[in-house]
Structures are given as C-alpha cells and as structure tokens.
C-alpha cells in the first residue's frame, strides 16, 4: 500500500484534512500520552505555517508534523513541531520521511525543535543537536535542539524553549 507524502500551506488546507491532522495529534498527545493540554494553539492556521503528513489511499493520516517560519529578532528561522505517528504505524520510517521533507524545505536556515527527551537521539540522526537544558512541559521531559546549517550562527540557548514538538 502506497503512503503518499503531502505538504500544504495552512491557508490551503481543506477542513477535512485539517480535521484528520488535528485528530491524530489529539490521539497521540492528549489521549495516548495522557497529557491534557491545549492542542489548538492558534499556530496551525498562521500564514507561514506548513503542514506535512503521510496519507493512506483512503485518506487516513498516518503521520504528521508542522513547520513554522519564525522571525525572532528579524532573522528568519524555522521550527518543527507536533511530530507524531499513529501507534500502529510506528517503526516504518514515517517520521524520517516527514523530517527529510521538512528539512529539505528549511534549506540553509536554522531550524529548532523542542524534542521529547527520549527522542533526542532520533533527531540527532537528522542533524539536530541539544541547545539548552532539559525542561519539563506538560509533565514530559523535553530538550531544545537546533539544526545548524552552513553559515548559520548558533542561537542563544535562552530563547530555544518556546514550542514543543509533542512527539
């Protein structure tokens, strides 16, 4: 069965697809991880937010992440967040496929992620390095990470812990 890689600007998402993306995120983060937090944070529909997902032929979303463009201090950077995969679909390289697509879009810009600590090694395999101390958000340990590209300056660690990936 072919799992299609999809990408969309927030403004171009149809209601049914947005529903499927949010449904998967709630299933993983709120229900599975027993983490009651406000999943709808207002960033999914921002003009510069992109969504990536893997979709079964029947339209079922298998995995998703969002890529947000940020302009802190006038510098364009990116942040990957809300990375998740259906429980039954884990271990098949879906997260790798999504990360590779998002990283390709980021190009030479600095990219941040606040990774759940137990996933830090997986993100390290994609070029991310720890950029600050571990912190706990919604009862789950996280570590701020950055992916440095050619010519990108290291960020100050004081501003890295602003958004969780909720992996």
Language model segments and positions:
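Short amphipathic alpha-helix that is part of the acyltransferase structural core
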Residues: 1-44, 51-60, 156-157, 166
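Conserved GNAT acetyl-CoA-binding A-motif
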Residues: 104-117
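Conserved beta-strand in the GNAT
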Residues: 53, 60-70, 76-84
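Short acidic/glycine-enriched loop/turn segments that link adjacent beta-strands
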Residues: 46, 74, 137-141
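Conserved acetyl-CoA pyrophosphate-binding loop and the N-cap/start of the following alpha-helix
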Residues: 89-101
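Conserved active-site alpha-helix within GNAT-family acetyltransferase domains
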Residues: 117-141
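Short hydrophobic/aromatic beta-strand element in the GNAT-like acyltransferase core
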Residues: 36-38, 49-53, 64, 82, ...
């Amino acid at each position: 069965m072919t799992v299609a890689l999809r990408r969309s600007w927030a403004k171009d998402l149809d209601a049914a697809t947005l529903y499927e993306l949010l449904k998967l995120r709630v299933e993983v983060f709120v229900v599975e991880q027993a983490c009651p937090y406000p999943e709808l944070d207002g960033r999914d529909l921002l003009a510069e937010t992109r969504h990536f997902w893997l979709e079964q032929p029947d339209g079922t979303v298998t995995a998703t992440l969002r890529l947000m463009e940020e302009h802190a201090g006038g510098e364009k950077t990116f942040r990957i967040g809300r990375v998740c995969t259906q429980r039954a679909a884990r271990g098949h390289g879906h997260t790798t496929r999504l990360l590779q697509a998002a990283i390709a879009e980021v190009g030479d810009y600095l990219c941040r992620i606040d990774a759940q600590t137990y996933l830090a090694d997986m993100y390290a395999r994609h070029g991310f390095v720890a950029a600050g101390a571990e912190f706990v958000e919604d009862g789950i340990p996280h570590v701020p990470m950055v992916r440095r590209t050619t010519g990108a300056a290291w960020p100050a660690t004081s501003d890295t812990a602003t958004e969780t990936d909720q992996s």
